[in-house]
Amino acid sequence: MAYYQQPHDITRLPAWQALQQHRAEMAGFSMREAFAGDPRRFQRFSLDSCGLLLDYSKNLITEKSLELLIQLAEQADLHEAIAALYNGERVNASEGRAALHTALRSPIGRRLLVDGNDIIPEVHRVLNQVTELVSRIHSGLWRGYSEKPIKEVVNIGIGGSFLGPQLVSEALRPFTQRGVRCHYLANIDGSEFRELTARLDPETTLFIVSSKSFGTLETLKNTLAARDWYLAMGGPEEQLHRHFIAVTSNRKAAIEFGIGEENIFPMWDWVGGRYSLWSAIGLPIALAIGVSNFKELLAGAYAMDEHFTQAPLAENMPVLMALLGVWYTNFWGAQSHAILPYDHYLRNFTKHLQQLDMESNGKSVRQDGTPLDIATGPIIWGGVGCNGQHAYHQLLHQGRLLVPADFIVPVNSYNPLSDHHQWLFANCLSQAQALMQGKTREEAEVELRAKGLSEDEVQRLAPHKVIPGNRPSNILVMNRIAPFNLGALVALYEHKVFVQSAIWGINAFDQWGVELGKEMGKEVYQRLTGASGEPASDASTQGLIEHFRSQHRG
């Protein structure tokens, strides 16, 4: 039976039990000693594919560790899970859906059936629709109600309709096309809306409403506010269709809003929001960087898809990263994972991965509904280097928590300034080196004596200078941030997340916790506004509602 119907209890697999024993054997393992004893450790534990170099040599692993982790993947039927994903089986068991985001970057000519229909022609039809729209806007043919060309595009969406597109359009800023500026409106906070629209001219602004249901609370409220702003600023209602387009599966609601049928782009139920930047949800990306660069992004993701499905497990970049995550989460007690991009243009990468990973693998039951008694998805956090070095890296180096980290860095910068990039790259490497190597008590004492301190001062300060080391990290290196390797990078993490979900036996494609919060939010709103006189079900919520009602002046 398929893994998504009857997943394994991995704790009963022989490889899991062997890994538990191996973990005990690794109690005294030292990465510093491992490097000293093996000059080829980097060569043995690194991998180059799709424009990305993965150095995973600074991990708490031996050849035996990897052998056992690969055995775990095999015994958990990972090959079958990957095949099920790509064949369009209903791997999202709780919602009875396939998860075919990979089809969005498949080249024309391939064939993939969903409910008996080949979806690849439809995917490329929509891509052609995106191409045509982008061409009209970039050429100045699409004009607003006053016949001025569109110069500002505002994407209204939240979650996957926002985080992925924002990440890519910001990361590929050097590829930005002239003439059109893209903005993002996500939060249901009037301050964000006011600050954005204060900089816009309604005559030259186009809004993209990105919502599968055309009813997501934050997106709908911001869309209604945008329409009110457009009308208040003098925009005629009969010309609304020139200033609003939609990416949605609810065509009826979009048409009722005033959006022209020809300006509605479809969404499919086999694409989850956090995996949707490759679809028409990526329209703001294509507007920002141009269609040819958007297609390069798709090509990079497709290259990673091919690597993922064809490379042996022991040479498979997403699989190796996923297994290392399982190793630390389930056998070393790690509860979080740091994402540390050393590039200004990747400053939003961590935010995208937070949704991708935590919304996918933050689960506590298996696909069949049986409870898990092991940890699953870790907390994803981090930020851009070198800023983090002067903030939270202290915890990574000397804290009591084990926090595996991924460093991401390009070799070349689009903006060379003196020797800045050499220093940036050096800091990235040295942070990973310091996490691995640390500083012993003896080294700390020698360092302090060399500074001329008295022996009493040496003994007083030495404990504070000791850095434990042996902290694991990966380093991902690319030539420079470009559409192809960025597509590969994002797809790499998508596949990593899926592999972990398959091993844990959980559903990476639903998010029922998010849905509960939405439902309860409606109830609280009714009480806040006085529409419901019933008290909240707990005293804390009721007390805060009463405080709001007594103080609110909005």
From Swiss-Prot:
The molecular function GO annotations come to: carbohydrate derivative binding; glucose-6-phosphate isomerase activity; monosaccharide binding
Question: Record's NCBIfam families?
Answer: PRK00179.1 (NF001211)
Organism equals: Ectopseudomonas mendocina (strain ymp) (Pseudomonas mendocina)
Where in or outside the cell it occurs: the entry states: Cytoplasm
Give the GO terms filed under biological process for this record. Answer: gluconeogenesis; glucose 6-phosphate metabolic process; glycolytic process
- Which purpose does this protein serve, as stated in its record? Catalyzes the reversible isomerization of glucose-6-phosphate to fructose-6-phosphate.
Entry EC number(s): 5.3.1.9
Give the catalytic activity.
Answer: alpha-D-glucose 6-phosphate = beta-D-fructose 6-phosphate
Q: Which domain of life is it from?
A: Bacteria
What pathway does the UniProt record associate with this protein?
A: Carbohydrate biosynthesis; gluconeogenesis; Carbohydrate degradation; glycolysis; D-glyceraldehyde 3-phosphate and glycerone phosphate from D-glucose: step 2/4
Show the GO cellular component annotation of the record: cytosol
Please name the InterPro entries in this protein's record. G6P_Isomerase, G6P_Isomerase_C, Phosphoglucose_isomerase_CS, SIS_dom_sf, SIS_PGI_1, SIS_PGI_2
Cite the active-site annotation: 359 (proton donor), 390, 518
Family designation: Belongs to the GPI family.
Query: What name does this protein carry?
Result: Glucose-6-phosphate isomerase
Q: Which UniProt keywords apply?
A: Cytoplasm, Gluconeogenesis, Glycolysis, Isomerase
Do you know which Gene3D superfamilies this protein is assigned to?
1.10.1390.10, Glucose-6-phosphate isomerase like protein, domain 1
